[in-house]
Amino acid sequence: VQVVVLALVAQVTLSQHWSYGWLPGGKRSVGELEATIKMMDTGGVVVLPEETSAHVSERLRPYDVILKKWMPHK
């Protein structure tokens, strides 16, 4: 049992972490980087390029469904 737990822990710690918006190797797409820079310049207001905002909204749809299901007050 201890060997199985150790193997599972090793697998999780050695696997690559995929953060939302990041590509393998710790690289971000150019559109998201531009949005981050623009957000810093505007005092926290995010201004996305048009093609990026359409792409991001498509990717976020499943997450919106999950959030509405688990957090109905937001």
UniProtKB/Swiss-Prot annotation:
Localization annotation: Secreted
Xref: InterPro entries: GnRH (IPR002012), Gonadoliberin (IPR019792)
Residues of the signal peptide: 1-15
Pfam family, one: GnRH
GO CC annotation: extracellular space
Summary of the function given for this chain in its UniProt record: Stimulates the secretion of gonadotropins.
UniProt-recorded name of the protein: Progonadoliberin-3
Organism classification: Eukaryota, Metazoa, Chordata, Craniata, Vertebrata
Gene designation: gnrh3
